[in-house]
């Protein structure tokens, strides 16, 4: 009888979760065949939720671990997993999607757009959201930038009456641009955070080796996707934001200060979680200036990432030999491809564990990881945020992983070319 190690079972569950993400549309269609409210319909809709996938398979793995050993072993394993990043994403997503923060962002973008000739306003609004916001992710963190960009683009692009070509091409470019746009600094992009301390990468290093290249690619990607959808975007009317003019400055400033404190100490869950509880109290006493917090959406995204971290920690046994055996170009292509099926932060973290990795190999590993960050929902930690916020604009309230993958190929290739040749 063949026996599997714990690592191998974790990889089987990981592979099952990856396949499951590509089948969510199938589960959604199957659910529609059953009476509404029935057990089968609810169960299939549950399986069709992208944010649930990795948490569900992680639960299956923990169940197996409890069965072959005992429940204490599963608890000990969970205690060894670092859930700081999922917790941070939950907190920053809930904060960044509040009414005062969004009102400030909407006011800046729409105000800048209104200065342009009327015929160019939609283009300026779109390009500002697709270029400036991803690059701001280098300073406010990628998850916060993803929330802002997704909510800015939602009323312009992600409505059900827009074409599938527009929605998927813009979503793909948004994911790629957020992934590479966070590389101007060493403290914003998850795959960079994982290696910056171990390899001594500071702000100057990131700007000189990644930042300027990625900024160019972000602009090129945004302009190309605009030109591809020029006629449809031009016909879209600018969103009308009701609350931005009436938001007091002190209210916006208080939210920005809370976010700044969380971002500054994003590596300390013991700090930012109590601070978030303080923030919840603040939003309650200032409820007249608030809209309902997106706690459900934020928790689902955190659950997805928590499952990814739980299973991803045990993938070292097969990823590390691949990383250590490849030449630079092979490693670059391999890292880009591997990012599609594993979180890019987990991939770069495993790179820090490979002894004797050359400086060139370090660069191409991270370059490939960020370039491939838009290929799938699991490729980059902020991606589930966009899916969670924008999926209502897609048929069946579900984003097709295959359509997203196909739409992301060209912007990913452009990112690879920029990081390899520039």
Language model regions located:
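Interfacial loop-to-helix junctions that mark the boundaries of transmembrane helices
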Residues: 1-9, 42-50, 71-86, 203-213, ...
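Juxtamembrane and boundary regions of transmembrane helices in multi-pass small-molecule transporters
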Residues: 2, 6-33, 162-168, 172, ...
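Hydrophobic mid-bilayer segments of alpha-helices in multi-pass membrane transport proteins
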Residues: 9-29, 49-67, 82-94, 148, ...
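Transmembrane alpha-helix boundary signature
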Residues: 62-77, 92-111, 135-147, 313-321, ...
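Transmembrane helical segments that form the transport core of multi-pass membrane transport proteins
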Residues: 68-71, 75-76, 102, 255-359
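Helix-loop-helix module between adjacent transmembrane segments
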Residues: 93-101, 119-120, 132-144, 176-185, ...
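Hydrophobic transmembrane alpha-helices that form the pore/transport pathway of multi-pass ion
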Residues: 124-180, 194, 349-367, 390-409, ...
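Long, contiguous bundles of hydrophobic transmembrane helices that form the permeation core
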Residues: 220-264, 271-276
